[in-house]
Amino acid sequence: MTRTRKSIPIIIYHTAQYAMYAYCIFAFLSLAISVCGELGMPISMGRTVLTVEHLLLQLTPIVLWAMFSLALPAETRLLRHCSEMVTICYMLTFILGLCFRSNLVTMTEDGQTPQMVTLLTRIQGAIGLLSVIASLMAGCHLVSKYKGNMHKLGIALVMVFIVWLAGSNIIPSAVFYLAGNTQQTAITCVNIIIEVSSTAVYIYAYYMMCRAINDAMQDAPNDETI
């Protein structure tokens, strides 16, 4: 049975679309659980649901970035390299996270942290920073060189970096300063602000990525037979 290249763009786009829908659903679920917990109204969820939620929130970005890389034309080397780098970094982070959660790595030994755990933690942090840099490079390139949905995706990726940077340093310091001595209130405000803003920008970024993939797939050749 023959099939045309037209089916390849369709598969790539629908895979990205389903991954984006799954990410949105579980991102909102995770946000609701976190915010309710911060406000003292914990939501009781089954262990299986929480495990599925955690896995999908890690796996769906890998799928989206991989599909975005496949959708890009061969001549867009910088974007392809950046998207491939983000995909690889997310995959390595996912694998390291599984090792930690599955107790494949001994976390404590005689009351002390083994050197292997320290090394893997530093590697995980370096990989995360590398993915942020690669994502920012892709975003800046998209903003400066493209129009339409690609341009909007670039803005979204830059927003992701800004929210990540603000959530790491700027917002916590500002909220603690404004909250004065009410430390618990400050912590609650910081957590809610970071969670809501992060969820919003990531959902917008992956939505625009799905739109950009659709645009790229419409421009792909589709009249050859495999």
Model-derived segments and spans:
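N-terminal topogenic module of multi-pass integral membrane proteins
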Residues: M1-M67
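Cytosolic juxtamembrane helix at the C-terminal end of the final transmembrane segment
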Residues: R3-Y13, A66-L79, L136-G154, Y202-E224
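Transmembrane alpha-helical segments of multi-pass membrane proteins
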Residues: H14-Q17, Y21-C24, R77-L96, L153-A166
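C-terminal transmembrane-bundle signature of multipass membrane proteins
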Residues: L29, I162-I226
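Interfacial non-cytosolic loop connecting adjacent transmembrane helices
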Residues: G37-V49, N103-I123, I171-I193
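Alpha-helical transmembrane segments of polytopic membrane proteins
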Residues: R47-I62, L119-V132, I187-T199
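Membrane-proximal helix-loop-helix units in multi-pass membrane proteins
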Residues: L92-M150
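Alpha-helical membrane segments in multi-pass integral membrane proteins
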Residues: A126-H141, K147-A174, S197
